[in-house]
Design a protein with these regions (language model features):
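Extracellular loop and loop/strand-boundary signature of outer-membrane beta-barrel proteins
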Residues: 55-57, 108-111, 177-183, 228-237, ...
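Outer-membrane beta-barrel translocator domains and adjoining extracellular loop/strand segments
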Residues: 81-87, 148-154, 223-232, 273-281
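Predominantly the C-terminal beta-signal and adjacent terminal strand-loop region
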Residues: 81-84, 90, 249, 253-308
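Short glycine/proline- and aromatic-enriched beta-strand/turn motifs that initiate or cap beta-hairpins
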Residues: 37-127, 293-295, 299-307
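Gram-negative (and chloroplast) outer-membrane scaffold detector with strong preference
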Residues: 60-65, 124-227, 299-304
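Bacterial Sec-dependent N-terminal signal peptides
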Residues: 1-44, 308
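Flexible, solvent-exposed coil segments and beta strand-coil junctions
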Residues: 98-106, 169-177, 224-230, 274-279
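Residues that define the transmembrane beta-barrel architecture of outer-membrane proteins
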Residues: 63-67, 117-121, 185-191, 209, ...
């Protein structure tokens, strides 16, 4: 080969070898850097054949298999209702009866575990059965108190002349507590199972804002405090009916685990077997009403899949 031609080829090949060396070094460095990032931000799954698969790290309250638990406190409101009473010697209805909740005065009872059932509280435990969809077990401990200072419409019959005489012009005044005291204060317990859909609204390094909405269905397990016609007060737990609700919440999650939850819900309660005496007589009451509730509290969420 002609010597000038060989010199030209040599001059052309030297830069190409240098570029190839730089490219290989760059690829090795980028592989190291991105490999380190994968280990810290992704899920690593090893297979039997030695292949390692990397999956994106999921947001909190978003992925199948995630779990959360929550405890909080509520305020409730109730529509007026008709309450029908039946028993030995009476069958009557009080119409358009008003009621309210009974929140406990702010104090140590809200954080003392030995007193937690005294306050109006909520508990939730949720499991994500698929991405962004959770099955949620809930206990809503509300308190329902009939307003004593009211006069209500009366229809029906009472055989006892003492209490029949308290009905004047188709109405009865409840203010003196002689005719009736009626409350579910230990409490108006709504044990429910719900489905909730979750959507991540804001995702930052250590903070997530997540919106959820859903519906629930359950049974009513109140401890009703009822005193009718001076009888012994009924005060016992009993499955009295059913309830259903629609709910929506905002969840602030910090460092992927700790959460603050604020929720609003509206629902319907129908109780057809409220015990009104301590014995096993057929004395009972029934009522149905619409309720609203706002609640807030703290919780914790975690993944059942582990990260590197």
């Amino acid at each position: 080969m002609d010597w000038p031609i060989m010199q030209i080829q040599s001059l052309l090949l030297k830069p190409m070898f240098k570029m190839k060396s730089l490219l290989v070094a760059g690829l090795m460095m980028s592989g190291f850097v991105f490999g380190q990032r994968i280990n810290s931000d992704t899920l690593k799954v090893a297979h039997d054949d030695g292949l390692i698969v990397y999956a994106n790290k999921p947001y909190p309250l978003s992925k199948k298999g995630q779990v959360f638990a929550f405890f909080g406190w509520n305020r409730g409101a109730f529509s007026n209702s008709d309450i029908h009473f039946t028993g030995n010697g009476y069958d009557f209805q009080l119409n358009n009866v008003s009621a309210r909740d009974r929140p406990t005065k702010l104090g140590i009872v809200y954080i003392d575990p030995s007193w937690f059932t005294v306050v109006q509280y909520n508990f939730r435990a949720g499991y994500f059965i698929k991405d962004n969809l959770a099955l949620v077990l809930g206990i809503d401990h509300m308190k329902y108190v009939m307003n004593q200072n009211q006069t209500v419409d009366f229809s029906g019959t009472i055989s006892d002349p003492k209490y029949a005489a308290m009905v004047q012009n188709g109405q009865v005044n409840l203010a003196d507590e002689q005719f009736l005291t009626f409350e579910h204060t230990d409490g108006l317990n709504y044990e429910n199972l719900g489905l909730e859909k979750y959507k991540n609204l804001v995702h930052k390094k250590n903070v997530d804002l997540i919106w959820s909405y859903g519906a629930g269905l359950g049974f009513m397990f109140p401890k009703s405090n009822v005193k009718l016609f001076g009888n012994d007060r009924s005060d016992r737990f009993h499955v009295a009916g059913m309830g259903t609700d629609l709910r929506s919440s905002l969840n602030l999650v910090f460092w992927n685990h700790w959460m603050i939850r604020a929720e609003a819900k509206a629902g319907y309660i129908n109780m057809w077997d409220i015990k009104t005496t301590l014995n096993n007589k057929p004395d009972k009451a029934r009522q149905d009403f619409v309720f609203g509730q706002v609640l807030a509290g703290i919780g914790y969420t975690f993944n059942t899949k582990k990260y590197n």
